[in-house]
Structure formats: C-alpha cells, structure tokens
Amino acid sequence: MNALQQKCRPKHQVLVLKCYPRTAKGAVDVKPNSSELSYLLYYATSRRSKIQKIGAFLEKKTASDVWRLRIGNVQVTLQILSALMEKLHKDSVLIAPFVLKILDTVLRSDDITMIESSLPTFGAFCDYHDAAFLLADQTYLRQYEEIVRLYAQLASTAAPGRESLTTPVKVRWRNAGLEAIRSVSTADALSSITGSQMHVIMPRILENLWSDTPDFLEILHQRLEEEEKVDTEKQLRRRTSIATVGTDGANDPNPVALSGTAGDVDKLAEEEVGVLAMQCLKSIFIVPTRAQIHGATVSLLKFIQEKVAQGNSVVELHDDRERDNGWAISIYGIIARWAPVQDRYTILVAALETLLRIPAQDATLDEQLALVTIMSSLLRSDVNLIGLSMMDVLLGLIKQMRKLFRLRSPASRSDDGNVATAESDTAVRQKNKHLVGRLELCIGDLATHVYYADQIADMVSAIILRLKPSRASSINSSPGGEKNGNEAGPGASTVELSESQQFDHYFCISTGRASGLRAIKEILLVANPQKKLTGNLAMSRNPVPIHVWEGTHWLLRDPDGHVRKAYMEAIVTWLDRETSFASEIAVEEKLPRSRSSIKMSKEASSGINRRAVSNASHRERGSKPRPSQFLALLHLVIYDNALQYVDFETDLVLLHILLTRLVLQLGVNAARYGLPMIYRLQEDVQEIETPLHKVRIAALCHGYFWALSEKFDFKESDIGQAIESEVARRKRKAFWVQGINMPPPSLDQVGIPGEALPQPDWDSASLEREELLPFDDREALVESVVARYHESLQAPPGSPGSPGRNPSGPILGSSLTSTGQADSDVELPVVFREHMLGDWSRDAAAAMLAAAGKSESLTGSKTETTGTRGHLTVKTNGMNGNGLTNGHGPTSPYGSQYNLMRPHSSHGHREKEREGTIPRHRKGSVRSAHSPAALSTGNRGTVASVDQLKLVLSGNPPPKTAGLAGDDDSGDSMVSYDYSLSDMSFNPATQNDQPGSPTSVKRPGTSSKRGPLNTHPPLGGAPNLHEEQNGDGSVPPVPPMPDMNMLGGKRSPIQAMENSFQEKGRRRSLNSRNGDGMRPKSVRSQETKTMDLQDLLRGIDSRPSEGSLGNVTRPPY
C-alpha cells in the first residue's frame, strides 16, 4: 500500500521525501541525504515551475512535523530550504514567501532547538533574497517585518514568560535572537527605506549592551577587537599539512568556565552575549548608507531618553569635562568611530535634531543634559566630522538656549507661595542653569576641529549678530546716550522682553547676552588650546579679525554686571588668543568690503586703460572699505563707565584690566585712543567732588600710564620712574585701588561689577590734605612710546624659531614704492602721534562717531555728506586731521596737541577759534585742489608734474597728491591720499614766515627725522585762503598755494612735485632736464631745517607756455 502511495505522488514530493533519512523520533542534528538533495536541487533548477510546488509541500510538511515535535525532520526541512536559496538565488523570489511561512511556524513553536536550527536558513534568506520584492508585494513585506519582529523579541532581556528559566537557557534565547539580528543587519533589505527595521532591532541590541558597570562597554569593545584580529590572522595564515596536529589551543575552553564559580560562568556568558550584540551593532554602522546610520542613531538616542526617564544614570558629569564618562558617552563614541568618515556627521546631526524636538519642560531637563553631554564628548574628541555644517549646529544650539531662557523667564512661572514648590523651583532653576552652561561649552567644542579658514570668525560673528540690545541698555549705550542724567543704576536689571518672536531671533534678556558672550569665550579658548604668549603664528586658519567686534561696544554699557563682565572676558580672551605681534604694528583697521563693492572694484580695474574720468566715476560708485570704529567706541564707553560706576571698585578694576590688555596686545593701535581719553579722565578728576571717587579715577589713570611703561619698556627712564614713584607713593599712603596692578589680575579673581563692596577705611581729613599728583609730561610719554615702537620693529628676531619682527607688508595699505617700503614699515604714522597728543572730549567724540555712522547708513551715495564720516583713518580730515568735518562740522576731540591738564575754559576758547578757518568748498580732483578761488576765477589749476598726469590717465593714481581739509576717502578725487615717506621730511610748521604760530613749536629729537605733529589748524587762527590769493603776483599762471598748516595732514602739490623730482633723480640724471627750469632744492636733507616756498615756486618756469589753454605750464624738466 505504501509503495502504491509513493508511485501516485508527484515527482517533486518524492524527491523531497527521499532527502529525509530514517531516524528515531526526537533525534536532533539530523542532516539530509546528500545525493538525494543534490538531485532535488538539479530538478528545481531545470524545472523552475516546480519551485513553488516544492515550497508549498515543504510548508505543509513542516507544519505537520512541528505539531508532532519531529525536530529532526524540521532540521532537514530547514537545510533543504537553505540549499534551495543558495542554489536558486536568482529565482529566490519564487520560494521566498514559503520560507517566511515556514520560519513563522518554527518561531511560534516556542522550541529553542528548532529556533536555533532555523538561524542558518534565515541567514541564507537575508543574503540571497531580492530586496526590490519588498516594494512590489505588501503581503510579502508584512511577512518579512513580522519575522524580523519575532526574531528580535528573542533577544529581549525581559521577554514575558521566561522569568522562571535558568540563566543558561535565557542566554540561548538571546543568542538566537542576536544571531538573527546580525543576519538582518548585513542584508540589503535593511538599507532600503521600506525594509528598515531599526526601531525593532536596535532596542534589542542595546538591551544586551546595557549595564550599570562603567567599563562594561570598554571590555566588550576590547574583546571584539581581539576576536577580529584573530580572524584576520587566520585568513592570512598559510595552509598547513593535514597531518599536522593542531596544538594552538584556539578552541580550548575558557579557564574561567572550568575553574570558576557559577557566578563567574554566568558573567562570562553575559560577556559572550554582549560581544555578539556588539558585532550586530558594528554591522549596522559600518555600512556606508547614510539613511541606515541616521535611523540607527535616532533609535539609540531614543533608548537613552527612555533610560533617563526611568531614572537610570547614562552619563556621569564632573567639573573637569575630560573626566565625563558613562554608558551613553562610551557607546556614542564607539559608533562614531565605526561609521564611514563621510557619513559620521549624521550621528551628530541626529543628536541635534533629537535635542531640538524635546519640549522645553522641567521634566525633560535631564534628557537634554544627557544629549548635550554626548554631543560635547563627540565634538571635543579626535573623531573628524567631515561634511558637518558647523553653522547649522551652532544655530541649533543657540535655538535650544533660547528655549531654556524662555523657560526661565519670570512670565513662564507662577508663584503660589508654597515652600515646597519654591524649593523645587530653585532646584529646577539650578538644573536649568547647569544645562545652559553645558550648552555654552558645547558651542565652544565646535571649534575643536576647523574645517575652513574663517570658521571661528563666522561662529563668533553669528553669536554677536544675535545679541540684541534691550530697551534699558539701548538708552545708556554710547555714543547716543547722555553721560550723566537719570540713567539706570548699576544694579538695575535689563528689561525682560517676553515676546516669543524676539526670543526666537535674539538673546533679548541679560542672562541670554551673558550666556552668548561666555559661549564666544569658550570658542576662542577651544580654538587656541596651546596659545603661547608670543602668539600662535602657525595657525591653519585665519585669526578672528577685530572688525568682528564692530558695533558691540554697547554691551559694556549694559546695566547688568554679569553682561559687562562676560563682555570683558570675551574681549580679553580674544586679545590673548587671537592677536600676535602683527597686531601691534600701527595699521588702520578696515572693515571688510561688501560683495557689491568688490564687484564694483573689479569692474573698475577691468577698464584700467580707459579715460581717467571714467575710471574715477567707477571709484565713485564703488564704496571703499571704511575704517573700523570699534576701538574708538570702546574707549568712549570705558570713559563713560569710569565716571558712572565710580562707586563700585570692581568696575574700575575690570576697566583697568581691559585697558591694560588692549595696550599689551594691540600696542599703539590701542594707545592712540586710550591715551587721549585717559588724559581727559585725569582732567575730570578736578571736577569730582568726593575724595574717594577722585582716588579711584586717579588710580585708573595712573594704572594706564603704568601699563604703557611696562608695555613699551621705558620704566627705567625718567618718566617711567616718575610714574612708578607716584604709584608707590599712593600705595604707601593707602590712596590706591586694590586690583590696579601690573601685571593686571585675572578676571576670575575679580567680582561681579555693580556689586557694592565695603568702603575702605580711609581718613577723610588725610584725603583732603594729600595731593594726587597728575602726570603732565604727555609729550615725553608719547615720544617714549614712539621710540620704543621703532626699536621693537627694528629689533632682530630672538631665535630661529621665533617669528620675524619686521612686518611683511606695507602699513596702512599705502601705495608706497619699493624704495620706501622698508622705511615706512618702521615708522609710526603721523596720525597716531597726533591722536596721542590731541585733545579729547566725550561729546565731540560721540558726535563725530555718530555722524560717521549716520553717513555710512546712506545707500552708497557719494555726496557732500560723506565729509562727515569721521572714520578713524589717516585719509580722513573729518576727525583725525583738523577736527572739522567738511569744513564746518563738529570739533574733533583729537584736533589739538595742547592737552596737558589745561582748564576747560581755554579748551572751549580754542575750539571756537578753530571754527571757520577751513574753507567749505569741496575739492574733487588735483586740478582744483589749490584754493577755493580757483573755481570762480576760471583757472583750472596746475598739474605739478607730467608723470602725475600720465599716471592719472593710465588709471593708476600717483601715491602722493594734494587735497584740502574737508576732503575724505569718498573717491571724489581722481588721486586719493596715501601715507608716504615725504610726510616725514616736510614740516611746514618750521617755516620762518610764521614765527608766532603756536603749532611751530619744535619737539626735541623729532623735528629732523619725523613728520609734523601739528598738521591740524593752528590754534591761534590761520590766515584766510581767500585773502592770500593776491599776496604774490610774481608768478601769475600759478595760483597761490594755501597755507601748509591748513592741509590737515594731506600733501600739497608742491610737496608732491618735490617728491616726484626726488624719485626721478634716483633714476635719471639731472642733465636731461630742460634748461629753462631751475633745479629745486631737496627738502629731505638733514641740514636744511626750513624751506622757502617762494623759491620753490620760482623754480617752475611758466614763461614758454604762458598763454596756453587752462594756464597749464611747461613741466619743469
């Protein structure tokens, strides 16, 4: 009967049944008959229509065998399916649905032996099935997802119904689940969007890796690396003889398992499971699929959040962040190193996205703290995150900080008067504050790796851009506010702006601004980890320029003391970390040009051979880089703070530290603004009524003089000893401020500004009797600064490893010739000396800077109003030269050199005398630069040299041209002024025809080799240029020259022509000149102390071309 039944069976069933060997019921480790299996595979490959019939028959037989617990038959069936999948991998789609149904039947049997036997079959299925089939058949997709879910449940550490099982049996179940997960993680189906099962398998993997032991992950990682190393050595080992007896002991049992206790054996088994879970995790992250890495990271972060919500500790925080550790930090760093280099950044981006999705609530602060900590650990590690958008991460962290500020705002909390609630609220606030501090440090960690040259500068700029002044601080900010009046006191809090849209865009509250400034400090500290005192000149990035701080001076006027101190800390950190010796070279800082301006300049340079008037029009349309006003505004704010917060000793100490650090790091670039302001502050001591306040302001002034003597190393000179002796005398008399010392104290040692300290126990009677001797020898002080500055530039380098002391480029961007560059590099520009010797007043400086900012806000128009810019540059007379803007603007605080403790009445009288001395006519070119009357008389002026005219026509303005006071750098003149060496050789103040001029006083030791210190208008009143026109008629075609003292630091045509003669004399013989002209005398000789302008004018022969067009005479050569 059985034979008849076998003959009636279809052939595919007969071939399948022949593969099952004869075994007893309950037998395990049964294998199919090899010859019959081979023929079945041949039959299936030659007849593809039979594949589905074979699968259906195996499914039916498996259900019967599982029901009857025929484990041997089930094992044979699974091995037949594995062989079919391997043999028919191109047609695996035909049998894949039946494989999934059979696996589902086996998994639901709840028999660990059969489930372990199904693992090779499932591995073959994952390796050979077509992932595209998942997109085509939704039923098949659901079957696949269900199988993955069932296998993943096996790996759970808290599976229901297994609590009563022994530890070895539990380990078997978890091993089976992890083996299946490893097969899934290496499959292509997992990489597809549809087949992604990260939310199913990742939690099971992480459950097997979770441990309260801090070093558990490190042990597993170390064991994994050792096993991989052994596997690699086996693959590279040469083939051995079959007769060789294996003696390496590689498969010997672990000694702990043989001699240890049951607890040791269980611990070893747990490690084995952990190693397998670690292999599964690695197989997920080593795949170069960005979507898979992102999904796995999101699942990991969700697991971490769940553990935090359950009260588990995933991170351990320390004051020293390098000691921070924990399970979350360890696993996050491990997966980051496993991920491909080009895809690592997705791990950090996923963490940031998860952080931003967490609602800003008190209950979620611990989750946010854990995520911020693991992000910081990754950012400051040696893992390179190529492709990461640093600015996007920065803005995301700033957004999270604003959410926390909104949570901490008073409007978001209610006070019900409950003591328990108040204590809980205090704890939450402390936790919130700690989280904000961690976010600040995380922002700083972004600077660990620099991926492009301007990254650090861009990060600092992005934060500064979001520091918005509040209503209260904007009232007090200089230069718009009043110096005195009903201002908010130092203890007043900033107006809290609770509008949600303002929170979304700016740090509107004082705590937010202080936090943003602390983040800037952290960025600068992290970007320069090994900063030396000599400056980090071997940087692979661009240093943060000074123009980044443009417009931030108002932060020093913030009513909140924490904001003021945070701002000072940021500035001092920038000075210490981002400046070098090159920052001490006297240079006019320029703000970066806009892209439209750069485009204009390119268009202008492309037409260099066009007519000069066309090229000039290009320059008029394109805006030039405007000078930076940061240092000028900063010293103005320091002046205001010194007088407003004189009641608080801490504020004055902090101001001393800031002023000292500016001088020590920027040298004369800071002293040009600081010295006039300090002398004005020293004069204001006389107007202060309280003796205690007088002592404090006087100590601040002498502390600045002390800093200058230390910086420029003239403390051994007479003025240096005078300064130190006065400081020592005041300290001895106890009329000094503790903290104003050299070197200055650290900012960490100083308290919060605005906090009242106990008043010093000073005797008021002795204060009235004692004298605070001011330091009046200002001119000698400036000369010492200038002399030491020259010596520092001329000094050779100290060692082969130190940077060269000579600057490599021209100073002030001047267009000097190659023969004059070496001298100009070691000479201090005249405008710096004038600033240090000039008068300074708060109101005039504020008005000048406000006018400059107002004119800059115009839409690129180059009209008459551009003369009121007052940019702190050598090219602008509006502020640095004669103190007038456009001839009739407000008086400059830097316009006078007589600021040696003079009374205010004389100062005002001189300012009134100065008004009206400069004609208000605007000059646009070299042909109209002689006098204002030239326009009305029809004379076009005189071209001093044909060389100058050739340079103008070719589009290259000569480096030495003329201009009257009131001209500026707006581009209206075809030839713009630049600093040149001839400025140092021509001193009109020493002319004999003006013996009574107060500006003709010689300064010892400098008149023979330095430029004029008095190129501003004479204080005693200058002759009117209109009256001077008819003064000399001996040379009719040549218009009379304006008074040289009225040029405000700019060159005259005679001066430019004289210097052009000198340059020609270096290149060609004087015999080649025309005999009609006279050879001018050189004014650069050391013997000639004065020069006669009339003799120089007579040297220009105008007779041969007296009646020519425009009175243009014959060139004198």
UniProtKB/Swiss-Prot annotation:
Which portions of the chain have biased composition (kind: Polar residues)? Answer: 601-616, 856-868, 982-1009
Cystine pairs = none
- Extent of Basic and acidic residues compositional bias: 908-918, 1076-1092
**Regions annotated as coiled coil:** none
What InterPro entries would the database entry show? Answer: EFR3, EFR3_HEAT-like_rpt
Which is one Pfam family of this protein? EFR3
UniProt-annotated stretches for the region Disordered: 473-494, 601-625, 792-822, 853-1117
- Tell me which Gene Ontology terms the entry assigns under biological process: protein localization to plasma membrane
Entry GO CC: plasma membrane
Family membership: Belongs to the EFR3 family.
Protein name, as recorded: Protein EFR3
